[in-house]
Amino acid sequence: MKLSEVRKQLEEARKLSPVELEKLVREKKRELMELRFQASIGQLSQNHKIRDLKRQIARLLTVLNEKRRQNA
């Protein structure tokens, strides 16, 4: 993932409410589970997608924690 894409994703995530962020994290975790399943049965040809998705989840959780600290 390019740096400009990461920055754009962070900007969009920071605009979301904590509830929306939690929903997005759940969706990404479900997607990660599906990718891991595909990898385990040999259907996933692009293994880098798992790593990228894990990083996206981490970024979303970071933004979510930032918002929670601001409201505390």
UniProtKB/Swiss-Prot annotation:
GO cellular component: cytosolic large ribosomal subunit
A GO biological-process term: translation
Keyword Ribonucleoprotein carried by entry: yes
Gene3D superfamilies the record matches: 1.10.287.310
Domain of life: Bacteria
Gene Ontology MF, one: structural constituent of ribosome
Sorted UniProt keywords: Ribonucleoprotein, Ribosomal protein
Record carries keyword Hydrolase: no
Family label: Belongs to the universal ribosomal protein uL29 family.
Role: One of the proteins that surrounds the polypeptide exit tunnel on the outside of the subunit.
Subunit note: Part of the 50S ribosomal subunit.
Family matches, as HAMAP family: Ribosomal_uL29 (MF_00374)
Protein name per the record: Large ribosomal subunit protein uL29
